[in-house]
């Protein structure tokens, strides 16, 4: 995704959307965990409202992350699970972030706009700076030298995770270029723990991509959703593809 000014957090990325190229105590003053607190809503396979956000889960979805913008580029990020037909709130971060230019309907999003797409998206896999851990989904990828998120509009690998050694995109373009791709190792803090969303899996050119759920940086994102480190770290081992996890972004 396009780069941000240095005072802002740069946004995230996306490896194999099902066939792509292959907590500190100080943070808790701004966030609130609500593990075990019940905030139950009737489950639905078509649409449900959780924390004021409209969620359109898949038929077998049992895990949801909601993102509710509270003001500007700030938001509340909550993890929910479904059991016996009811949705239960498990934990929440109040210091979530979205794009520096707010929210936008997905079909109106433009690459480099700094806007986060509204809607419900799958969470197909994760990546980060750490070696694979037993509790994480097997689809996890550890960032290695030469890994990029392709945002080159002329590449057939657009909006895909790819290593430059495999070619097929202009990885050498400078960050100032409209078709520059994102080198993942440039963001070790934000992408220490990062979860890919299925936004623009169809690779519509100029719509952008690299929309992730990742660790907070110093400010807003360039389109991703971010949350405190403790939240993402706690979420990672809980996500289970057999439970069809999704993220729902609203306001």
Predicted features, each with a name:
Residues 1-28:
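Secretory targeting and sorting signals
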């Amino acid at each position: 995704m396009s780069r941000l000014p240095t005072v802002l957090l740069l946004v995230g990325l996306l490896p194999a959307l099902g066939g792509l190229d292959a907590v500190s105590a100080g943070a808790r003053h701004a966030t609130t965990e609500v593990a075990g607190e019940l905030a139950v809503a009737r489950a639905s396979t078509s649409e449900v409202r959780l924390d004021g956000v409209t969620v359109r889960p898949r038929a077998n979805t049992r895990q949801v992350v909601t993102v509710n913008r509270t003001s500007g580029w700030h938001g509340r990020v909550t993890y929910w699970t479904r059991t016996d037909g009811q949705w239960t709130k498990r934990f929440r971060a109040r210091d979530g972030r979205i794009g520096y230019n707010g929210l936008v309907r997905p079909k109106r999003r433009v690459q480099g706009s700094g806007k986060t797409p509204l809607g419900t998206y799958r969470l197909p896999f994760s990546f980060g700076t750490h070696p694979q851990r037993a509790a994480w989904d097997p689809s996890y990828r550890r960032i290695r030298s030469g890994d990029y998120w392709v945002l080159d509009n002329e590449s057939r690998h657009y909006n895909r995770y790819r290593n430059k050694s495999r070619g097929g995109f202009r990885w050498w373009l400078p960050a100032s270029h409209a078709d520059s791709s994102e080198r993942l190792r440039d963001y070790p803090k934000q992408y220490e723990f990062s979860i890919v969303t299925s936004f623009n899996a169809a690779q519509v050119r100029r719509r952008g991509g690299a929309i992730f759920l990742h660790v907070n940086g110093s400010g807003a994102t360039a389109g991703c959703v971010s949350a405190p480190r403790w939240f993402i770290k706690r979420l990672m081992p809980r996500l289970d593809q057999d439970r069809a996890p999704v993220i729902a972004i609203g306001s």
